[in-house]
Design a protein with these regions (language model features):
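Accessory carbohydrate-recognition regions in carbohydrate-active enzymes
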Residues: 1-254
C-alpha cells in the first residue's frame, strides 16, 4: 500500500527544484513511539482516495482518520474524522524553525523563517489555524509541534501570509467546508474552461487539462488584501512590505 505522511503546503513546482516555506500537517491519534516522520506515517488505499484539483480525500489506515481538503487562494479548509471516536491530534513539521503561539482556545499562529535559493535574507511565512473544537494541549517534540484536540471530528481552517500573523488570520477561509469546496470547484472549472480543444482522440482533452492544471497549480498571486481592501505584498528584493499588486511564476522551462 502507498504511504501517507500528511498534507504538505508547498511552493515547489517540480521535484527537480527546491521548495521554500513548506509545512507538513499529519493527523494522528494516540501516543507516537518516535519523534520523526517515519513513526507518524500511515498506509492508505489508493483506490478509495480522491485527488482532484478542488478536493482531496484520503483515509489513514493506521489511525483510521479520514482527511478531506479543499483549497482557497491563501490556504485551505480541512475536515478530519476519526471513525472510532478517538481524539484527534495534528503534527506540524517543516524544514524551517517553527514558532507556535496559541491565540485562544481554538486558534494557533505559526511563524517559520528560512533561507531560499534567491533571497539574501530569510523569508518569513505566517500560518493561522482555527479549529471547530477546542485545543487540549500544544507541545514541542524535537523540532516539530503536536496539537491535541478535544474531539474525533474537526474542521480546520488554514491560511498563510508573507506579511504578518494578523494578515494570516484575516486570510482564513470565511466559509464552511462544503461552500469552500463548491467555490474551489467553480474556480478550477473557470480556469480549465478558458480553451476549447479540438479532440482527435479520447485522451486529448484529459492530457490538455492535465497540462493546464499543472500550469495554474503553482501559486501566482503574491499580494494580500487588508481589512480596508488595500493590496500589499512582500517585496523580496528589499525584504519590506510595499503597496500594490505582485504576481509571481515559477520560471521553470520544463
Amino acid at each position: 500500500l502507498p504511504i501517507f505522511q500528511g498534507i504538505r503546503l508547498t511552493h515547489q513546482p517540480s521535484p527537480w527544484i527546491g521548495d521554500y516555506s513548506w509545512l507538513l500537517l499529519t493527523p494522528v491519534t494516540g501516543e507516537i513511539s518516535g519523534d520523526t516522520l517515519f513513526y507518524r506515517q500511515s498506509s492508505y488505499n489508493f483506490e478509495r482516495a480522491i485527488f482532484n484539483p478542488h478536493y482531496l480525500r484520503i483515509f489513514s489506515e493506521r489511525y483510521q482518520i479520514e482527511t478531506q481538503l479543499s483549497p482557497t487562494c491563501y490556504g485551505a479548509s480541512i475536515q478530519l474524522r476519526q471513525i472510532q471516536g478517538k481524539n484527534l491530534s495534528l503534527y506540524v513539521h517543516a524544514a524551517d524553525d517553527l514558532t507556535l503561539e496559541q491565540v485562544d482556545h481554538r486558534t494557533i499562529d505559526i511563524r517559520q523563517s528560512g533561507l531560499t535559493e534567491t533571497n539574501k535574507s530569510p523569508l518569513a511565512m505566517f500560518t493561522a489555524l482555527t479549529f471547530s473544537v477546542e485545543i487540549l494541549s500544544i507541545k514541542q517534540e524535537g523540532q516539530d509541534w503536536r496539537i491535541d484536540l478535544a474531539g474525533a471530528e474537526a474542521q480546520v481552517q488554514l491560511a498563510t501570509s508573507f506579511i504578518s500573523k494578523e494578515q494570516a488570520l484575516l486570510n482564513l477561509p470565511k466559509q464552511d467546508f462544503e461552500d469552500t469546496q463548491t467555490n474551489a470547484k467553480a474556480s478550477w472549472e473557470d480556469l480549465l474552461g478558458h480553451f476549447d480543444v479540438v479532440e482527435t482522440g479520447p485522451v486529448d482533452r484529459t492530457f490538455f487539462d492535465h497540462c493546464l492544471y499543472r500550469l495554474f497549480l503553482f501559486p501566482q498571486t503574491f499580494y494580500e488584501v487588508n481589512e480596508q481592501g488595500e493590496s500589499s505584498h512582500m517585496d523580496l528584493a528589499s525584504g519590506t512590505i510595499k503597496p500594490g499588486l505582485l504576481f509571481t511564476n515559477n520560471g521553470f522551462w520544463d
